[in-house]
Swiss-Prot record:
Name of the protein in question: 2,3-bisphosphoglycerate-independent phosphoglycerate mutase
Binding positions for Mn(2+) 1 per the UniProt entry: D398, H402, H457
Binding positions for substrate per the UniProt entry: H126, R156, D157, R188, R194, R258, P259, D260, R261, K331
Gene3D superfamilies tied to this protein: Alkaline Phosphatase, subunit A, BPG-independent phosphoglycerate mutase, domain B
Annotated PANTHER family: 2,3-BISPHOSPHOGLYCERATE-INDEPENDENT PHOSPHOGLYCERATE MUTASE
Single GO MF annotation: phosphoglycerate mutase activity
Species of the source: Trichodesmium erythraeum (strain IMS101)
Catalysed conversion reaction: (2R)-2-phosphoglycerate = (2R)-3-phosphoglycerate
Keywords: Glycolysis, Isomerase, Manganese, Metal-binding
UniProt keyword Ribonucleoprotein present: no
Amino acid sequence: MKNGSISPVVLIILDGWGYREEKYGNAIAVGKTPNIDSLWQAYPRTLIQASGKAVGLPEGQMGNSEVGHLNIGAGRVVPQELVRISDAIEDGLIVQNQAIKKICQDVIERNSKLHLVGLCSSGGVHSHVNHLLGLLDVAKAKGISDVCVHAITDGRDTNPKSGLHVLKQIEYHTNQIGIGRIATVSGRYYAMDRDKRWDRIQKAYEVMTQDGYGTGCSASDLLQKSYAEGITDEFVLPVRVAPGAVEPGDGVIFFNFRPDRARQLTQAFVAPDFNGFERQTIQPLTFLTFTQYDSSFPVLVAFEPQNFNNILGQVISQHGLRQFRTAETEKYAHVTYFFNGGLEQPFEGEDRELVQSPMVSHYDEAPEMSAEDLTEVAIAAVKKQIYSLIVINYANPDMVGHTGAMDAAVNAVQTVDHCLGKLLQGISKVGGTAIIIADHGNAEYMWDEDGNPWTAHTTNLVPFILIEGEVSKIPGHGTKVPLRENGCLADIAPTILEILNLPQPAEMTGKSIIKKAEYELKPNRTPVRVGL
């Protein structure tokens, strides 16, 4: 080992790799994963919580990548936007929200339309249908009569055909309160792209902004026709159902609370220098987003970002250490923006590298995704021996798991397992420490009890494996490190700080998963286990 070189702690996040013993519909159990299997047997390991209250969500609510990475990076249980917004609606406080009051006032003064745009879903990952129903109630209370709902159907974080029930729920509510109509319907495949596939966004945008009489049938009838044609919720082609285009003078509320898949459509509406596709600027237009999608967007924000101090990346930086983050396109925001508590800018000493995801319609067409290239990027960072912390996310189990294609998901997990072996060899050569975790479950549950494809996340526990190595071999002293049970994602950052022998700040309320142990600190800040 070179003098002054660093043996890093490498946090390996297997996105969507939940734990479930039953093999039925379990791509992880069915797949051949010799590396993860041998690591699970040979090294300190435990299962940790990644859903519900353990990550700041309601009890029983499945976790997701945004929530998972927020908790991992913050080192504390982070109250999630789903809970914040639901509480504001249930308590009636949303009526007093200054941004909500402002947009309602503008619509009333201009005698214009209010448009409610968002994912109509009970999944609670990007949005919740109850928030839309709450906004409809607010509009009625404010005396706004012309309200258009631009429904984005899910089928990815929920059952592929659950949208029918949700749209009927919305139709019932609008009939009950006497205002509102579903004006357009778009599958999230189009309206919520996040990979700059602007042709998809364009289809949704144009349907929302070009007026017409619509199909002449209800939104729920339209969805039933789509099902009959073999098109499920996620892939519904954007279509106008009833009159009500977004026009100058109108107000728009985008009620998704998760930013990553709401940014591109928002850009199309509000970015002055937008060049994704040709479109006419709609002015004046009061545009409100439930949360901050991007600090540069000229919009109202109903629920401002929570500020987190002394998160993992910040602590690493404050101690003069360098760190590296890498993921492919689909998960890049998670290891950067979300991992850093919603901050776009990297900390001092934080390097990043994006690996392009394959440009395919569905990831079951390319289940390997860009895992091999990503692994090479991570190995190169390890070899430099300048980083104390390296964070890498493998997207395959989650992204392919969302397709509901079992064979492709098996291929995906096998690809990740193969790459994991290569990465661990690189880590072992520099005496590094690897921590393997997942942010939530997915690929371990591909079929429901009736054999139908399951495309959503799960509430299952996720793995935690600690691998400490010497210069020439992986085993080292890692097999003797005792781990505690009942941990959660908030405990990952304190664990990393303990390994790096850095003090845990008071704001970090998580607890190291490593039980009390004595360490001898190497000059390169990687500890070696010396005794219990």
